[in-house]
Every structure is written in structure tokens, then in C-alpha cells.
Amino acid sequence: MTLYSKIIGTGSYLPPNRVTNQDLIERLALDGIETSDEWIVSRSGISARHYADADMQSSDLAVEAAKRALDMAKLAANDIDLIILATSTPDFFGGFPSTACVVQRKLGVTNGCAAVDVQAVCSGFVYALATADKFIKSGSHKNVLVIGAEVFSRIIDFKDRTTCVLFGDGSGAVVMTASEEPGVLATKLHADGSYGDILCGPGRISNGVLEGSAFMYMDGQAVFKLAIGLLDKVANEVLQLAKMDASEVDWIVPHQANIRIMQGTAKKLGLSMDKMIVTVDQHGNTSAASIPMALDVGVRDGRIKPGQNVMMEGVGGGFTWGAVLARM
């Protein structure tokens, strides 16, 4: 019998603090930094994003999304035998205990299931999903909880208008299970460390002292130019692996980085933007959380239906990129 991994539940969570472009314009003005709604929207497509309260961590957001995904899957927390959590903003500096272990505790999972974090920034959820797929297909695990959760508002520099307007906080989750019916059809992951300096968190700790910046850095133009070509290439790679044509893809659920990157990707694939789930306008760029959040939106509003083919793809710091083609 051939084993497949199949998504049987999705969930997402946005912290309640919604921040509009006007809110940011007023905040930046206090430091003498000028921007406008037109400038932000024309370059990114973003009108609003959400920020977590100071006492909320990535694990808190992750737990809410996970509960919703488990509810849709009709599974209890103790039915999960592996948790994979993608984040670049873990609960603890240094990354341990892992945020996945914190989520395990907060969900009340007591079965001793494995729990691990994955760090590939905005590609993180794709990396986590592809990893879960391999564990399930090997027969070693049956029910896997895959989460992307971020509090990027903690690491953006509000004196840099080119980046601070882009990012937001949130979480998304899926439950995957072993199935005799095709679910995940193909996955492909890549990385190229030679581009590590165009999107990074350059600071490091030495002897308890921060060296360098505590904030993220992004060369937006370099990322934009690289991203469109890489996303087109990896999308075609998974289509080839699945022996499918782009016309057979019902929906693209991309990393919600920038509307221009998404438009460029759709154009290269010869697909209409009508086939793309877009949430960047209201969520901003939520890094590893963006794909599962957008997927959940598409599932819950009825656009993404059982049996349809969904392409999930993303690029992130490292430089990392990848794609997953799945039948819902």
C-alpha cells in the first residue's frame, strides 16, 4: 500500500491589534520619518497588519491556530505524534527550549510526541510541510501538526520605513495525516547561502553582549529580483515531479511577501491572479505564518475545495526557497 500525507485541517490566528497604514504613518512621523498610504500600497499591496501584545509570544499565537486546525481535523491534541513549528521569532533567545516544545505543553499534549522547530524564515512553513510529508510517507508518524508562527514586530526597525511597513504577526497551522488517497503530490526545497546577506538578522550574542543590530535587514530590490525567478523555477520543478501542467493547478497559495512578487510569479507561470489566494493586503508579511494563514482563509471562505490542487511556495532568508503541490 502506498502511503500519502494529506491535509485534513487548517487553522489561523491574528492577534487583535490591527495596525493600518495610517497608524504607522503617524508613528513614524513622531521620529520625523515621512511615508504615505500610497507609497506603502503601491510598493507592497499592504494596507494593514496585526501586532501581538507585549505579553504574547509566538507559541501563544501558534496554539490558537493549532486548536482551530485540530478542531477542523476532528482530532484531539494527544492524537498528534509529531509537531513541526516554523519560526524565526522563537519564544526564547537562542531557540531553546524550542517553541514547538512550548506549544506541545500549552496544548496539553502528554503522549511524548516529537516536537521540533524549523528555521527557514519565510520559506519555513514550506520546509516544515515537506519534512512532515516525508515522516508520514516513511510510516514512522501518522498525525503531524505543522505550524508557522511569528512575532516579527519585535525585530523590525521602526526607523527604517522600507521594512517596518511590511511585516506583521500571526500564525497558521495544518494537520496532516497518513492517507491512501493522494494528498501531497510533490515537494522541492532549495537553499543558497551565498545570498545570506540580502535578508538577515545580522546581530549576534558574544559573552552576553549584543554585537551588531538587533533588527532584521533586507535589501528589498535584491530580494525582489531573485525571488520571482526562483519561485517560477521551483514551481515548475514540483509540477514536473507530479507530472502535471500549470493549468491543472486550481490555486496558488504563495508566501505573502509583496503583491508585486506574487503578480510576477503568476505571470511567469501563465496563471491569472484570480487563482492566487491573496491576504498580504490585510495581514502584511508574516514570514513563516503567511502561507498557512492564507491557506486557512481560502479553505474557510470556500474557495479551496476538496480534491483541488494547491501550490504553496515561498522564498526566505538564507537564502531559502521551496514549493509543495498538494491535493486537498
UniProtKB/Swiss-Prot annotation:
GO BP term, example: fatty acid biosynthetic process
Pathway in which the depicted protein is active: Lipid metabolism; fatty acid biosynthesis
Stored InterPro entries: ACP_syn_III_C (IPR013747), ACP_syn_III_N (IPR013751), FabH (IPR004655), Thiolase-like (IPR016039)
A single MF term (Gene Ontology): beta-ketoacyl-acyl-carrier-protein synthase III activity
Transmembrane segments: none
Catalyzed reaction equations: malonyl-[ACP] + acetyl-CoA + H(+) = 3-oxobutanoyl-[ACP] + CO2 + CoA
Catalytic center residues: C122, H255, N285
Enzyme Commission designation: 2.3.1.180
Organism domain of life: Bacteria
Gene Ontology cellular component list: cytoplasm
Pfam families listed in its UniProt record: ACP_syn_III, ACP_syn_III_C
EC class name: transferase
Region (ACP-binding): 256-260
Compartments where found: Cytoplasm
Keywords: Acyltransferase, Cytoplasm, Fatty acid biosynthesis, Fatty acid metabolism, Lipid biosynthesis, Lipid metabolism, Multifunctional enzyme, Transferase
Task of the protein: Catalyzes the condensation reaction of fatty acid synthesis by the addition to an acyl acceptor of two carbons from malonyl-ACP. Catalyzes the first condensation reaction which initiates fatty acid synthesis and may therefore play a role in governing the total rate of fatty acid production. Possesses both acetoacetyl-ACP synthase and acetyl transacylase activities. Its substrate specificity determines the biosynthesis of branched-chain and/or straight-chain of fatty acids.
Assembly: Homodimer.
Entries under PANTHER family matching the protein: 3-OXOACYL-[ACYL-CARRIER-PROTEIN] SYNTHASE, BETA-KETOACYL-[ACYL-CARRIER-PROTEIN] SYNTHASE III, CHLOROPLASTIC
NCBIfam families noted in UniProt: fabH, PRK09352.1
Record comment regarding domains: The last Arg residue of the ACP-binding site is essential for the weak association between ACP/AcpP and FabH.
Family that this chain belongs to: Belongs to the thiolase-like superfamily. FabH family.
Name of the protein: Beta-ketoacyl-[acyl-carrier-protein] synthase III
Gene that this sequence comes from: fabH
